[in-house]
C-alpha cells in the first residue's frame, strides 16, 4: 500500500484528503495549520482538514511554520512514499521534499503556468477569465513552479464567485489526483515543464484590493471584483458617506449612460443603478452598510426615501 503524508488546511483540501483515505492509501500523517480563534466569540476552531484526520484517527501535525520545526523531522521519519499538498500555503524545505520516496505533488487551483501563488481562484474571477482549473505538479522549492503531471479545465460561469469555484475545483482536484497517482506510482507518467514565458502570479489578496473603484473600472470589472472577493473578504466602497460592502451586483450590458462615475443613474423602490467607468452602469442587488446586516437593495432603499436622486454623486473618489 502506498503511504502518503497529506498537507492542507481549508475546506478545498478536505475532500481531497477524504478521497485518499477511501481509496485505501495509507495516510501516515496530516499536516495542517494550528487551530485558530474564529468569529466574534473567538472560538478555537480546527481546520476542515484536521477534522477529517481526527475522524479517521490519523496523526495530526500543526506547526505554525513547518521549516525548521520539530514536526518536520517527525514527518521525515515517517518515510512516506508520497507527500501530497493542497492549499497548504507554506514553502516546503528541500530536505522535506526529498523525504518522499516517489515524490511530492501539489494540487493547485489554476491552469499553470497562469496564476502561481496563494490566490489563483480569486484572480481568475477578478481578471474575467472564462475558465480555470486544476494542475497537479511536482513540488519544487520555487513557488508553484514544478513540472506538470496533469491538468483539467472547467468554465467560470457568470454567477460563479470564489466560494462556488473553490467548491467545484475541490472536486475536480480530488478526481484528477485519484486518476494521476496510480500512473505516477507505476512510473507511467511524463511530467511536462511549465512554459516560463507564460507565467503570471496570484499573490494573496491585500486590503487595498477590496476597494471598488467606480472611476476607473467598468461595470463588468466591478462585478468581477465583487465575485472574486465573495464570500470573503467582500469588496466595498463608500456609498452615501458610509463604508458599504457590496455582496451582489449586476452589470447592465445594454445601457450606455451619461452620468459621471459614482452618480445615480436611476432609483426605484427595488432598484439602484450607479454609473461606472466608460459610460457603463451597474445595478446593486445586495449590500451591507457598516455595522448592519447584509440586506437586499429593496430593504436598503426603504430607509432612504429622500436620497439617491438621479445624477446625485453617491460614491466619491
From Swiss-Prot:
The keyword Transferase is assigned to this record: yes
EC numbers, comma separated: 2.1.2.9
A molecular function GO annotation: methionyl-tRNA formyltransferase activity
Signal peptide: none
PROSITE patterns (UniProt xref): GART
Keyword presence, Repeat: no
Any coiled-coil regions, as ranges: none
Family assignment from sequence similarity: Belongs to the Fmt family.
Protein function: Attaches a formyl group to the free amino group of methionyl-tRNA(fMet). The formyl group appears to play a dual role in the initiator identity of N-formylmethionyl-tRNA by promoting its recognition by IF2 and preventing the misappropriation of this tRNA by the elongation apparatus.
Name of the protein described by the UniProt record: Methionyl-tRNA formyltransferase
Classification lineage: Bacteria, Bacillati, Bacillota, Bacilli, Lactobacillales
